[in-house]
Amino acid sequence: MKSLLFVVFIFLTTTYAAKVSFKVIAPDAKNRVHVNINGVLVELKASDPDVPYYTGFAELKHGQSYNYVVDGNAEPFKRLLNGSSTKNEFFNRPVTYATNIPELPSILTEGSWTRGDTSNPIWDSNYVPSIFVTGNPREMNELIENVKKNTYKTKITFIGPETINTFEGCTLGLHKPGRKHNDAKQSWIWALPEGQFMANRNWFKIRHMEEDPTQLREKLYADILRKMGTYANEANMVRFFINKEGMGIFNMLDDVIMYSYINAMFYHGDTPEQLGGLYDGASGASFNFPGDFDSFIPNVESPLDQDAIEPFSKAFTSIDFLEDEQVKTIGKYFDYDQFLRFMVMEFLTGDWDGYWQEQTNDGAYIDINDHNKIYYLGQDFDATFGVNLEQKREFVNVSYTEYPKLFPGGVLINRLLQNPGVKKTFENYLKITVQEIFNNATLGPYVTARHEFLAPDLQWDRSIKQRSPGNIFGWTFEQTYENLFEGVTAPGKNSGGADWGLLEWVAAKEKAVKSYLSSSEAADAATVTQVPEAPGTDGTPSESTAWPHANTRFRQAEASNTHKIGTSSPSNFIVKIKQGTVSSSSSIKRTPCILPLVILASTLFASFF
């Protein structure tokens, strides 16, 4: 009897057709969109004519496959679904939600940042969101073709893995348009209407990543920093459309010099009565005293001007860094534990356009709700992993101990490293980061899996002819893969600066750091003597082994999924999930600045130093 019941149960589950909700994004659709189930076409409809997002219901048996048909053209692959609703799928993309990308380990957990909002699905890197801007056609063409500094009112629709959000009355513009050496593929910014937020943010920026053939470096940098327990910007890859015209794939990220980022990452969206001073660090923003504090450009809503940086810089200059008690004191007014983590990453990636080497692309936030504590802000992580690096290739082997002599302008990190305890902490962070994340055993599978997932969108991106004026490198789709392992030369008028492969750099830096640490006193780095206010981590991670394919192309036979390189259309991609199926699955409160705030900051610092 039990056997009979089991057979009946199996029969029912394999023959019963359930009503399923289908959702697909089809930007190129001109007429009709259908879901095809065993030759039966069911039409899907778009509720908003501005957004090519088609939905509908159809009967689907358990284990039955389906695909989408747009204007008579069917996807050349089948999809499988477990559940009563698809995720927000994209036409001709075989993998909607990645399940085979390894998770990077979280390290340096003691003292890691916990104040920020990072859990929203818009930052889920296993999905590629789609963003649709709807604006006046004449204004949008003017913006694209003439790269105006004007901003325009638009409607912006954000489609995530499960949800769709539309905001009317957004302000859209280009990020720093019209500069002499801008790339034709522009970067964009927009603000949500006053009082409206998404993921506790009301300001978004997307960067083009044209300097990097792989388009992976900048997001990878931020991903690693957050795994190191920092408050680094969130980032995710997105598809971007203006009036249904595809502009390409971009890196959407927090703009750290905007209060949107501060509100989300420092206060979980619970905005305090008074926000602190916020600054964009331009060239020369070194924190040195005496120095040019005009390099710190206050946010237009900042209640403090650039002179509020001076008391900290002056006090920092007076510190005797051989005295632990003085270092402990300054830790109350400068989160240098977080700063050390940022500097470890700058060193490992050879970030030549950041704080340590050039004193630029940084920033600062003064939290007036926490004793005017200063937080270092890092931004724009594109000049990393060997991209556009003018140093000789031997530079990858240079020890961090040589940096103070090579780059004397980085006074914050150079002086902190004069303290033996801080130096030990820095070396411990460096060692753990290389052992646990910054090595080819970890990053090799992670980076190649991310490339596999993004490959159809990278090929689409490389096929777009940009209508804006500017530099065109002409990186090919094949080079998005090749530059993971070796240098490549752009076929355009400018040959580009991709002389290093991304993983080639990682392998070389991993080898150099391990060699340095093994020949120094870092043999006992796990028993570091900590300086108060700069905690390290407990335990000694196991030593990683070199990823065997660090300097060669990833062997398709050894990968957990495969794809054909150099095919003519995204539909030719073969993506095999481990399970064997294709899964589808600006308004911030502020009050006017008052002079006593600056005086108070000066008094507080003077009383401690």
From Swiss-Prot:
Keywords, alphabetical: Cell membrane, Glycoprotein, GPI-anchor, Lipoprotein, Membrane, Signal
Spans annotated as Disordered: 527-547
InterPro entries found in the cross-reference section: Ig-like_fold, Spore_coat_CotH_CotH2/3/7
Compartment(s) where it occurs, according to its Swiss-Prot or TrEMBL record: Cell membrane
Residues spanning the signal sequence: 1-17
Primary site of residence: membrane
Keyword Cell inner membrane found: no
Lipid-attached positions, GPI-anchor amidated serine: S584
Proregion span(s): 585-609
Classification via Gene3D superfamilies: Immunoglobulins
GO cellular component, one term: side of membrane
Sugar-bearing residue positions: N82, N397, N440
Protein purpose: May play a role in cell adhesion.
Stated name of the protein: Spore coat protein homolog 1
UniProt source species: Rhizopus delemar (strain RA 99-880 / ATCC MYA-4621 / FGSC 9543 / NRRL 43880)
